[in-house]
Amino acid sequence: MPTYSSMLHAKMIKSPAALNTPQPSPKQAVSNAHRLDGGSSYVVSLSEISSCPTSTTNSLFAAATPSTLLLSALYCTPPSQLRMKSSCTLTLFIPPLNTAASPTLPDTSCHGEWNTTTRPCLAASTALMYSL
């Protein structure tokens, strides 16, 4: 199994209509992953905005098979921040698949003053392929 580390850059793409029509539960936004450098960097476009439970801040999980890394991330920002920014970037560190380490969320420009009540949020789910 290969040893590698990957930085995944996810750009949030919001739509005014989505901001005005929150959903009762987070919905997955399936996105396209594009390799940036022929190796471990990807750009993922996110578009689905929905309503977050009040207890949700952010969550992240990854599951690996010999040829696929399935990455899902859920994170929230206050409505004011979503309206002010045309886009923001979420950076995830994916550890080598042959270690027991978990993916981490070291930095994102979407961090800030989260609401304590219902917040718009984005859910991303994509499969990242890597070479054996």
From Swiss-Prot:
The organism's superkingdom is given as Viruses
Q: What is this protein called?
A: Uncharacterized ORF4 protein
Q: Which organism is it from?
A: Botrytis virus X (isolate Botrytis cinerea/New Zealand/Howitt/2006)
